[in-house]
Amino acid sequence: DGRFAGYQAALQDSGFAYDPSLVCNVLNNGPALRAVDKLFDERNPDGFFCFNDARAWYVYECAARRGLTVGKDVSIVGVDNHRVFAETLEPQLTTVELPHYEMGYWAACKLISMIERKPVDSSSWPNTTAPMPPLDSPIPAKIHCALIEKGSVRS
């Protein structure tokens, strides 16, 4: 997965070694909460980078059960900028925004361009928050994702 490869590359670029014991690969409530609890018990981490904003909720929950304050005692970053999680968790979740609208718009334009075998006039594209790659980019194409800084990371 691209996110996992990016996580490993960011660790390496920052001079940290990848440690598989710090990675939890869980899909649902019970196992996720137990995995986060185990990390707190065994490693006492000061921060979490979560696969998505929904997974970040588990870290908030475990931190609260331990009397820890998110953004002060522990930092949490999610991925998606999913409004239900990123804006309703307290403090609000710092997150890497996936530009879903832009990704869908680009994919639809790319598909139309391929079906019609002609380029799409990109001058008529909507103004978006994330720059879109050219339609002649190879698939898979990379789209810029912005870090949306909120209150869940210690300053």
Task: For each feature predicted by the language model, list its residue ranges.
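Bacterial carbohydrate/catabolite-sensing allosteric modules
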Residues: D1-S155
